[in-house]
Amino acid sequence: MSTENKQSLPAITLAAIGVVYGDIGTSPLYTLRECLSGQFGFGVERDAVFGFLSLIFWLLVFVVSFKYLTFVMRADNAGEGGILTLMSLAGRNTSARMTSVLVILGLIGGSFFYGEVVITPAISVMSAIEGLEIAAPSLDPYIVPLSIVVLTLLFMIQKHGTGMVGKLFAPIMLAWFLVLAVLGARSILNNPEVLQALNPVWAVHFFLEYKAVSFAALGAVVLSITGVEALYADMGHFGKLPIRVAWFSVVLPSLVLNYFGQGALLLKTPEAIKNPFFLLAPDWALIPMLILATLATVIASQAVISGVFSLTRQAVRLGYLSPMRIIHTSEMESGQIYIPVVNWLLYFAVVIVIVSFEHSSNLAAAYGIAVTGTMVLTSILFATAARKNWHWSRILVGLMVVAFLCVDVPLFSANLEKLFSGGWLPLSLGLVMFIIMTTWKSERFRLLRRMHEHGNSLDAMITSLEKSPPVRVPGTAVYMSRALNVIPFALLHNLKHNKVLHERVILLTLRTEDAPYVHNVKRVTLEQLSPTFWRVVASYGWRETPNVEEIFHRCGLEGLSCRMMETSFFMSHESLIIGDKRPWYLRLRGKLFLLLQRNALRAPDQFEIPPNRVIELGTQVEI
């Protein structure tokens, strides 16, 4: 990981604290309150407090420390992580049918993230501002408007990038975790009995004591590990070691101290269940805590927003989402991007969620299904990658996946009970994203197959043109070609209608590799097909944005000199119609594809080609 080489371990570890652990680090704001709020038929009872604390502690140890930090983070693609990366790794050495299944699982996991990302900013910021209920009860009616104002400002600054503000994230989050630890330790010293809950026997006793209702209570316990996927998804930004060091040295101790501190407070003062997090603080510290909590939740929300930008770019580059405008907000960091359409769709969705649910406790019912669903899929995909790619023994992989699923499946099942009380929200959003991604991928493949099914051989056509050339005009023409040995539609139509050809013709194919980055040395491959025809294949990773000017520069280094303002770019523009023979459900999918195609970013804008150098030739295609 290059970042680790450029910066010292303490510096990059501090940066990881500021970004990776925002979501899981703000969970103490609401987790224990939701566990003991009385919704499961029992209130602040000693056995319940000890049971929940034991469950939270061992979930943090098993799921975060053991599963993700020890095992899942081994699965990286050139240092990058995330559910789509894991999907790609798992499908490398499998059959075509198995690969299709793994792709579906990966897309479901990615869709779950889109469902979760709408809830995270809403519940985080609202739970922080709800500290006003303790500090200034008269301001309670303003919690929803204030939450919207804070998030509006956050979404508005996205287009400017977070480079300057981002430098403050790490020290603020470090201060947040230190305050969590101090407040928790202070409360534990007043009631050290609570440390008994470190014994897993209390977790077992909880299930025996509360029987059936204890299973439903797992749906609240899982709030303590929301954001765990960020550890894996952000691996490419910081590297494995800094993320692990940050967890074991700062984050885990702070979280455990704070949860147990809240438990100690509740054992002595059960009425503190109204908001045990803020009631840990002395009266004089309530306003500073409210400000710090709001800043921490804004940072957690920023991490989620950046995550959805990164996932969207990856999905676009892998062909699962339609092309859209991606703006780089930093000349130094390629990972800092802004996608306007995603930003504002997410903003409006978050505002609607805040207005509809009104309180973070109501949102807690919607939280968890997407998180635990992704955990289940991660276990399956990781086990497949371990067996197929690294050839781990069947016994080891079997024991590992059984251990993971013995935790993941009960957590997911418990959260399914929330389906009608809010859980439908992330599932619905995830379903919409899954339909969009599968529609774009499958219909785009169908379109390309229809366009090329009657195509003649490119080599044969070039040979024919060299033997009997049409009228040649001065200059260079570039034709975008999706497949190597297929004649571009724009070239066919130009010959058919204009009956001319430029003196030099370049067939340009853009290829997305199964890697986040492609080294500049391997960026461009040139092949001279004839005295006047050249084939250029430009390779990019899924974290990179293709740029024609850069491609021309690499071509010049290879001996093919091109000047942007002296080159004509010919592109085909498909006018799509839906075939009458398609079943009704495929016709619906076709209409969705037409809508996506109509709103997709045009090729000249994707590749930063000057509009006055582009010639589009239309063709009608039935899909």
From Swiss-Prot:
Matches recorded under InterPro entries: K+_transporter, K_trans_C, K_trans_N, Kup
Keywords, comma-separated and alphabetical: Cell inner membrane, Cell membrane, Ion transport, Membrane, Potassium, Potassium transport, Symport, Transmembrane, Transmembrane helix, Transport
Bilayer-spanning residue ranges: 9-29, 49-69, 101-121, 137-157, 163-183, 212-232, 247-267, 276-296, 337-357, 363-383, 395-415, 419-439
UniProt main location, coarse: membrane
UniProt name for this protein: Low affinity potassium transport system protein Kup
Keyword Metal-binding attached: no
Catalysis: reaction(s): K(+)(in) + H(+)(in) = K(+)(out) + H(+)(out)
Upper classification of the organism: Bacteria, Pseudomonadati, Pseudomonadota, Gammaproteobacteria, Enterobacterales
Cellular location(s): Cell inner membrane
GO cellular component, one term: plasma membrane
Homology family: Belongs to the HAK/KUP transporter (TC 2.A.72) family.
Membrane-related topology note: Multi-pass membrane protein
Function summary: Responsible for the low-affinity transport of potassium into the cell. Likely operates as a K(+):H(+) symporter.
UniProt-listed NCBIfam families: kup, PRK10745.1
Protein origin, superkingdom: Bacteria
GO molecular function: potassium ion transmembrane transporter activity; symporter activity
